[in-house]
Amino acid sequence: MSVPPGSIIVSDWHRCPDSREFFSKILHKKRRRKFGLLEAPMMPPQMNVDLVRYKVFLSGKTGVGKSALAARLAGLDLPKMHYETTGIETTVVFWPVRLKESGRVLFFRFELWDCGESAMRRFDHMLLSCKEKVDAILFLFSFTDRGSFDDLTNQISRITEPSDRVVKLVVGTKFDLFMHTDVTESDVTHFQEVWGLPVFRVGGDVSAGLGEVAPLLNALAENLWHQDCMAASSVSISPQAALRETSSEIIV
């Protein structure tokens, strides 16, 4: 089960005045900065901020909008035309959050992995590479493609095991094209009741800024942090030491 929104981090913190100096590090002229695989936001030396890294795999049928979602979450220009990803593409997304209990600020670094469906069918190692040391999986479907929604259960069963320690969230794309929807709200509600997974909705061609991506990025951050804290407590590590030994660093 997922963590209730706002139970661990401050919801809508991106709207609060005290978040501006942190969000300014991922913005340039009111647009999101583009970060390469080896880049990170620059912070003043006196402001020690913990950076936590996570690998996130985007799963879904061809045409549901995996590449578009990655671009949207990173604040990049959305693809003007559809093309199938020929191999594996990675996109880096930085997102600051404030923990409710301690007031501590964390910078999350999400490395989004997107692989074309045809490539995964042709080369078995593609899926294995995407799943290797993965922390979270976003299962995508399109509101305009009933088949992609019906395929969700197959995706989840094929890609994950009940014993996997991985955060699972579902994203419905092209939600703004309601005139052409093939998936009803009752369908979504029934799916959530059966699988216990939250479903997030994103639009099609137009990006609406931080407010549009905040619910999904906050949910990713909240569930991943909770997962790590639970894992740490199971081996008697204090929550303050829950920063991942192999993937945490201080931004300077």
Swiss-Prot record:
Transmembrane segments: none annotated. Its main location: cytoplasm. GTP binds at residues 62-67, 173-176. SUPFAM superfamilies: P-loop containing nucleoside triphosphate hydrolases. Coiled coil: none annotated. It is found in: Cytoplasm, Cytoskeleton, Cilium basal body. One of its GO terms (molecular function) is GTPase activity. This is Ciliogenesis and planar polarity effector 2. It comes from Danio rerio (Zebrafish). The lineage of its organism: Eukaryota, Metazoa, Chordata, Craniata, Vertebrata.
